Amino acid sequence: MFPRDARLDMYDPELAKAIAAEVRRQEDHVELIASENYCSTLVMQVQGSQLTNKYAEGYSGKRYYGGCEYVDIAEQLAIERAKQLFGADYANVQPHSGSQANQAVYFALLQPGDTILGMSLAHGGHLTHGANVNVSGKLFNAVQYGVNAQGLIDYEAVESLALEHRPKMVVAGFSAYSQKIDWVRFRAIADQVGAYLLVDMAHVAGLVAAGVYPNPLPHAHVVTSTTHKTLRGPRGGIIVAQAPQEALVKKLQSIVFPGIQGGPLMHVIAAKAVAFKEALEPAFKVYQQQVVKNAKAMAETLMLRGYKIVSGGTENHLMLVDMIGRDVSGRDAEGALGQAHITVNKNAVPDDPRSPFVTSGLRLGTPAVTTRGYQEQDCVDLAHWIADVLDAPADATVIAAVREKVAAQCKKYPVYR
């Protein structure tokens, strides 16, 4: 029925052209969006396998459909590898995304109208941590904490807010915070008010797995994550916990299915299993160590060039460039760097006077360039080129010169050989 040698460019040339252009973009542009990475050819091979054809509602050994004996193997491999990777006693690999993993935990442990205490989106948090434009901020009474004048989480303020509002859940984690989080302190705050502690480690899961960032599992009631970003797997979500009570496990299992999802994506779950196996390899730890070294090199160089980094540096894979007071906005900087084939994203910074669609900041991250093979000196060079463009965002000559240097660097470090 379906020939295995069918060619997309012959059947759907418009789509094939768009895909080919994206492949070229990924090879020819430097990727510095902190939430992006390149997964392996093995991950892509499995995600494009015939497992996409199989419906498998339920869990391994307890499906609502027949013929699941082989996808059961794939899911169980993903579960056991995730548990080994993070030191977990429980893992659910079915969430379709990190946002759905967070949603599952909220619905499992809270009632609509309950109070949650999460990091403000404007100060480095995530939409799903109680932002008023997200369902987490609409269904729940969301109280938000932030960073102090030094750009660091204000734990005293978090504690004060917790004592004042008595949340049912405290949410720790971020999408744009460059320092280490004190999970012990967060658990102590949650315990003071009898709240659950949910940690969203989506951005640092790969660093945690490699032991180069503190593991939240011994301290949180529940931990969620994406499976891409620093973990370098397929796009998806995961829920893990260490020594959870049986009642908590039952709530989490039943809320993922049938609570908020139907059939799991078995081809994605199998790809997660491959990514987790890759993350258990010794080379993955070396990779994550280099991610942090590269981020530090980039942040230090940008600061030497006169650019402010929120919190004064980085201890993970990302940094937030604060351009408040400068003529160039985050949006304009993103556009100018894009012309130089450096891909970044505009980002709000603490106390940003500009709108979220314009912003006064840039978020930069090193997971993708480190996957390509970049070392510290490459990131120092790249940071200088970024500063060159930010110093003269409307200068076509500067942009062209940087674009030429980027092309040579990308050619030196191809994504897929």
From Swiss-Prot:
CDD domains recorded: SHMT
Modified residues (N6-(pyridoxal phosphate)lysine): K229
The enzyme's E.C. designation: 2.1.2.1
A GO term from the CC aspect: cytosol
Alphabetized GO MF terms: glycine hydroxymethyltransferase activity; pyridoxal phosphate binding
Site (Plays an important role in substrate specificity): H228
Recorded catalytic activity of this chain's protein: (6R)-5,10-methylene-5,6,7,8-tetrahydrofolate + glycine + H2O = (6S)-5,6,7,8-tetrahydrofolate + L-serine
GO BP, sorted A to Z: glycine biosynthetic process from serine; tetrahydrofolate interconversion
Domain of life: Bacteria
Keyword annotations: Amino-acid biosynthesis, Cytoplasm, One-carbon metabolism, Pyridoxal phosphate, Transferase
Keyword Transferase: yes
Binding-site positions, (6S)-5,6,7,8-tetrahydrofolate: L121, G125, H126, L127, S355, P356, F357
Cytoplasm recorded as keyword: yes
Cofactor: pyridoxal 5'-phosphate
Subcellular locations according to the entry: Cytoplasm
Pfam families the UniProt entry points to: SHMT
NCBIfam families per the UniProt record, alphabetical: PRK00011.1
HAMAP family: SHMT
Family: Belongs to the SHMT family.
PANTHER family attached to this UniProt entry: SERINE HYDROXYMETHYLTRANSFERASE
Self-association state and partner proteins as the record states: Homodimer.
Function, in words: Catalyzes the reversible interconversion of serine and glycine with tetrahydrofolate (THF) serving as the one-carbon carrier. This reaction serves as the major source of one-carbon groups required for the biosynthesis of purines, thymidylate, methionine, and other important biomolecules. Also exhibits THF-independent aldolase activity toward beta-hydroxyamino acids, producing glycine and aldehydes, via a retro-aldol mechanism.
Name of the protein this chain belongs to: Serine hydroxymethyltransferase
